């Protein structure tokens, strides 16, 4: 493809390489380093004048450093006369801070949107935003892609009894997500209502729906410390589920998450590779990964060629 350049930030170079390989491109030359005072320095190592530039950087790992690196890369390309700069952010940072839920709370997702725009981003490509209204925080186009087609494909190919399963949301907020998957599989859905007293601590769970003698598949957009999904798995087993799976778009897995998964009753915890999982998989055999590089690569190809990306909302590209 002419007049296109793809650069990778340091957060997830493996995913960036897979995207570039699928597009038949080489990653652009970029050098990132830190000065002795920990300031981030980025050097774009090739001309981007008149080019359609895509910068891949996920909101994971050292999130603040990686966000700053992305902003600097966007700005460096913009002032070097790139014709368009698109930030490809598989896991959007600060997405959970999307509303003012208590006095004096910041809306940090809006701040990040402002920063990306001011840095010079012309377009954002992301996946499974924690709150879809974050798209409205931008005055530039945002393509919020979905892992759902890849999740459906994984369920059909890897769970032999998928016709006898129930899709379960671990909270009321995910009801729309699980009903969509359940409808497309033509199976039932359930949800778990949770009463939470402190952040990351679940007090009481109430199952709404039937999982008795069925395979229960927990579906959520992200899991951090995994307290919620591990409690939910216990609840589902006690309600008569034969087996329990968890399928998540963004596997953050911080703090005690890995030990909780190892001690939980999951057959498998399936995540996409919006966040690197290699190190975590070494410590937890239950973690399996769905590759979504083909979805992001096809979104980039269609964007570059001026084509619609809505096909990707219901299909997995080959």
From Swiss-Prot:
ATP binds at residues 96-101, 130. Changing residue 231 to D: In a colorectal cancer sample; somatic mutation. It is an enzyme of class 2 (transferase). This is Ribose-phosphate pyrophosphokinase 1. Changing residue 132 to F: No effect on catalytic activity. The gene is PRPS1. GO terms for cellular component: cytoplasm; cytosol; ribose phosphate diphosphokinase complex. Activated by magnesium and inorganic phosphate. Inhibited by ADP and GDP. GO terms for molecular function: ATP binding; identical protein binding; kinase activity; magnesium ion binding; protein homodimerization activity; ribose phosphate diphosphokinase activity. It is linked to Phosphoribosyl pyrophosphate synthetase I deficiency is a rare condition caused by mutations in PRPS1 that lead to variable disease phenotypes including optic atrophy, retinitis pigmentosa, ataxia, peripheral neuropathy and hearing loss. Phosphoribosylpyrophosphate synthetase superactivity: Familial disorder characterized by excessive purine production, gout and uric acid urolithiasis. Catalyzes the synthesis of phosphoribosylpyrophosphate (PRPP) that is essential for nucleotide synthesis. Its EC number is 2.7.6.1. Homodimer. The active form is probably a hexamer composed of 3 homodimers. It catalyses: D-ribose 5-phosphate + ATP = 5-phospho-alpha-D-ribose 1-diphosphate + AMP + H(+). Residues 212-227 are annotated as: Binding of phosphoribosylpyrophosphate. Pfam families: Pribosyl_synth, Pribosyltran_N. One of its GO terms (biological process) is hypoxanthine biosynthetic process. Changing residue 219 to G: In a breast cancer sample; somatic mutation. Its cofactor is Mg(2+). NCBIfam families: PRK01259.1, ribP_PPkin. The keyword DNA damage does not apply. Mg(2+) binds at residues 128, 130, 139, 143. Changing residue 203 to H: In a breast cancer sample; somatic mutation. Changing residue 129 to I: In PRPS1 superactivity; no effect on Km; resistant to inhibition by ADP and GDP. Keywords: ATP-binding, Charcot-Marie-Tooth disease, Deafness, Disease variant, Gout, Intellectual disability, Kinase, Magnesium, Metal-binding, Neurodegeneration, Neuropathy, Non-syndromic deafness, Nucleotide biosynthesis, Nucleotide-binding, Retinitis pigmentosa, Transferase. It comes from Homo sapiens. The keyword Transferase applies.
């Amino acid at each position: 493809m002419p007049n296109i350049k793809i650069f990778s930030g340091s957060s997830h170079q493996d995913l960036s390489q897979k995207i570039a390989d699928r597009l038949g491109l080489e990653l652009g030359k970029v050098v990132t380093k830190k000065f002795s005072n920990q300031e981030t320095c980025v050097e774009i190592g090739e001309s981007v004048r008149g080019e359609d530039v895509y910068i891949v950087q996920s909101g994971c790992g050292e999130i603040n450093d990686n966000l700053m690196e992305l902003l600097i890369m966007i700005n460096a390309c913009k002032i070097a006369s790139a014709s368009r700069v698109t930030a490809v952010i598989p896991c959007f940072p600060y997405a959970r801070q999307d509303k003012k839920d208590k006095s004096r709370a910041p809306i940090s997702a809006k701040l990040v949107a402002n920063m990306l725009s001011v840095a010079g981003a012309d377009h954002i490509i992301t996946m499974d935003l924690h709150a879809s209204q974050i798209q409205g925080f931008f005055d530039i186009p945002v393509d919020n892609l979905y892992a759902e087609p890849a999740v459906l494909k994984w369920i059909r190919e890897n769970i032999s009894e998928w016709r006898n399963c129930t899709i379960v949301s671990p909270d009321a907020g995910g009801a729309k997500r699980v009903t969509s998957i359940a409808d497309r599989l033509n199976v039932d859905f359930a949800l778990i209502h949770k009463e939470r007293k402190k952040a990351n601590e679940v007090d009481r769970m109430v199952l709404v729906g039937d999982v008795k003698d069925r395979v229960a598949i927990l579906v959520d957009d992200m899991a951090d410390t995994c307290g919620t999904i591990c409690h939910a798995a216990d609840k589902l087993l006690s309600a008569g589920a034969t087996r329990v799976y968890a399928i998540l778009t963004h596997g953050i897995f911080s703090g005690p998450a890995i030990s909780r998964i190892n001690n939980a009753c999951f057959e498998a915890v399936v995540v996409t590779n919006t966040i690197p999982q290699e190190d975590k998989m070494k410590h937890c055999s239950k973690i399996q990964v769905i590759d979504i590089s083909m979805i992001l690569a096809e979104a980039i190809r269609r964007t570059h060629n001026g084509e619609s990306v809505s096909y990707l909302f219901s299909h997995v590209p080959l």
